[in-house]
């Protein structure tokens, strides 16, 4: 009797399909934008600018969701309603989708002949001639997010301490994206943008403080328990 063949590690998984799809769509969009921009077909059109703004907003919301989901997972708060494996899947999905939309957000500007963002100005921090510091906040946030996505596949090779330290970068990425969108977004002064900014920042601050205080409380209990076990 033949034994059933176990799936190999190289087989497709939902996560790899998602990553491949997002990367493919992003690259195709970038190429399409470059083609329209260089041929002059879209000259005078503001479509690229609107697409960039919309996708940037979606990327920010997805990144926020990823950070919140990660905090719910690390603090144990979300385990009351959702099982940890599902929380982790949602966290990874939101992170990957955020990178896809953020890449689209930058690459689509290559087709806008009015703004004129070459590839180097999009992918290299501080290389932009337009607001280099604020643009770099978004670029660094994207690179950090890509690093975190890569860490999902390397988790088995990392220690718990290294994994936690690496994921502190997610907070840096979120707040840099927050500053990038708030400072450069043309809608930042509107009421709805203010509501979104405060509505996304507040949960991250609250859950971050909850995590810090919970960690300190657990550490104090462990230290206190160890002290009581010491012989007199």
Task: Kindly label every feature range from the protein language model.
Residues 1-232:
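Membrane-embedded alpha-helical bundles that constitute the cytochrome b-like, heme-associated redox core
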């Amino acid at each position: 009797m033949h034994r059933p063949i176990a799936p190999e590690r190289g087989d497709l998984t939902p996560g790899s399909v998602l990553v491949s799809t997002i990367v493919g769509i992003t690259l195709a969009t970038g190429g399409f934008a470059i083609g329209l921009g260089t041929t002059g077909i879209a000259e005078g059109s503001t479509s690229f600018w609107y697409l960039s703004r919309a996708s940037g907003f979606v990327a920010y919301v997805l990144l926020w969701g990823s950070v919140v989901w990660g905090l719910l997972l690390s603090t144990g708060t979300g385990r009351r309603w959702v099982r940890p494996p599902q929380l982790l899947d949602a966290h990874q999905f939101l992170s990957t989708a955020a990178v896809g939309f953020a890449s689209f957000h930058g690459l689509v500007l290559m087709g806008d002949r009015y703004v004129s963002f070459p590839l180097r100005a999009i992918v290299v921090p501080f290389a932009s001639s337009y607001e280099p510091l604020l643009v770099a906040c978004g670029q660094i946030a994207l690179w950090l997010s890509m690093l975190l996505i890569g860490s999902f596949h390397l988790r088995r090779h990392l220690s718990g301490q290294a994994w936690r330290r690496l994921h502190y970068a997610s907070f840096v990425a979120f707040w840099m994206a927050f500053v990038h969108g708030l400072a450069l977004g043309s809608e930042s002064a509107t009421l709805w943008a203010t509501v979104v900014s405060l509505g996304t920042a507040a949960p991250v601050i609250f859950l971050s403080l909850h995590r810090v205080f919970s960690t300190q409380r657990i550490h104090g209990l462990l230290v206190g328990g160890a002290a009581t076990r010491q012989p007199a």
